[in-house]
């Protein structure tokens, strides 16, 4: 293959990747507003700036597109937990996990709300991912927390409930952003409010698991 052909192939691959990402971004916006049942592929195609035929070339059905969006969300959602490291001091590791989770709520609110909506519906299209990659990762990190508890580095706490508490307290600011803004007049986009939220959530959780 000539150098020119390689460059052409590379540009074509980049164009395809950009088009697929545009479709996924449009689908996220539409699904988060209307849900899978209220969304039409024509809406997504128009939002992405492609034809419906072109959309179906990459994602052959609405369900396939929805699953692709949810898998991308799950990758974003799991990234902070993957960064949870045993070699850090326990309280430092947990503080950092809280920070990363709150940043996800700030930076990807639509993704968080769509994920929440899927959970409320029983996650019919996401069971394989939840019982596979998600469960394995949570089990692995729970074992780290259990080890810290056993060695006296953390107060006695059930690892699963600690993780659930962190999820609940950080994702609330994305999933219930309208309520948070109605009560406080602020969102996580306000840097001072983000910092105050982070410090308060960290303090409430850390003080509950600190060894005394």
Label each PLM-derived region with a short phrase:
Residues 69-96, 144-147:
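Amphipathic alpha-helical linker/stalk segments
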Residues 1-7, 103, 107, 135, ...:
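C-terminal peripheral helix-coil segments that are non-catalytic and often amphipathic
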Residues 82-111, 159-166:
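Hydrophobic alpha-helical connector segments
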Residues 22, 30-64, 68:
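Helix-turn-helix
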Residues 19-28, 44, 69-73, 77, ...:
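Generic hydrophobic, amphipathic alpha-helix propensity
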């Amino acid at each position: 293959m000539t150098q020119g052909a390689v460059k052409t192939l590379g540009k074509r691959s980049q164009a395809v990747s950009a088009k697929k990402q545009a479709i996924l971004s449009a689908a996220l916006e539409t699904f988060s507003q209307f849900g899978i049942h209220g969304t039409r592929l024509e809406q997504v195609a128009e939002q992405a700036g492609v034809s419906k035929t072109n959309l179906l070339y990459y994602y052959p059905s609405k369900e396939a597109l929805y699953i692709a969006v949810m898998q991308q969300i799950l990758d974003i959602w799991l990234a902070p937990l993957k960064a949870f490291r045993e070699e850090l001091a326990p309280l430092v590791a947990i503080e950092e996990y809280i920070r990363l989770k709150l940043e996800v709520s700030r930076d990807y609110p639509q993704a968080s709300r769509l994920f929440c909506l899927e959970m409320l519906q029983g996650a019919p299209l996401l069971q394989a991912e939840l019982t596979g990659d998600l469960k394995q990762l949570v089990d692995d990190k729970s074992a780290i927390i259990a080890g810290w508890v056993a060695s006296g580095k953390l107060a006695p706490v059930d690892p699963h409930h600690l993780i659930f508490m962190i999820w609940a307290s950080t994702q609330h600011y994305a999933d219930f952003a309208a309520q948070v803004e109605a009560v406080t007049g602020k969102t996580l986009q306000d840097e001072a409010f983000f910092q105050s939220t982070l410090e308060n959530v960290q303090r409430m959780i850390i003080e509950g698991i600190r060894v005394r």
